[in-house]
Amino acid sequence: HLQVAPKDFARMYNLSQALVGPVLASATNSPLLFGKRLWSETRIALFEQAVDTRKTGTHMRDASARVSFGQRWCEKSILEIYKEDIARFRSLVGTDLDEDAIDVLDRGQIPELKALRLHNGTVYRWNRACYGVRDVDHADGTKSRVPHLRVEMRVLPSGPTILDEISNTALWLGLMSEYGERLEDV
C-alpha cells in the first residue's frame, strides 16, 4: 500500500496502473527452471476463480468480472472507482453496520465507511483504491482520527523468498515515488 494525498490520488492510481506491466514483468516467477516445472503465478487466477459470480450462460457473458485490470483511467478522484464498483457489483458479504456516515460527519467526526470498505475488498482490481482511518497520537497527549487514501498494488507475486517479495515491493514503491514526483500525467 502507498498512502497518497487526496488531490494526488487519480494521478498516482493511474501511475500504478501504468507500472503494472513493467513491475509484474520483473517480479514474475518463472514456472520453469533448469527444465523442471515449478509452481506458477496463481495470485490473480486464484482470485478470479474465488470471486467470479457471473453465470456461465451466454446471456451473462457481458457482465464485468470482479477481478480485472480496470476499464479506464481515473480522471478526478477515488469516487469514480467506488461509484463504478458499487454500480457494477452486488455485495458478496454483509455484516451488521451501525454507522450512519452522514450523522458521523454532522458530529464533526470521521466516518469509517465500513460497508464501502467491505464491498471494496470483494472487487479485485489489480490496483485497489483504499480508504482508511487511523488513530494519531499528538505531542500534547490528544488523539485524533485521520482519514487517508492508499493505492494497493495487488498483482505482486508471492515468494519464492521474503527477500524477493521485499525487492518487488521496493521496486514498485521506488517507481511510484520517483515518477510520482516527476510526472504530472501518465
Please place each PLM-identified region on the residue numbering.
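C-terminal accessory/tail domains of diverse enzymes
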Residues: 1, 5-186
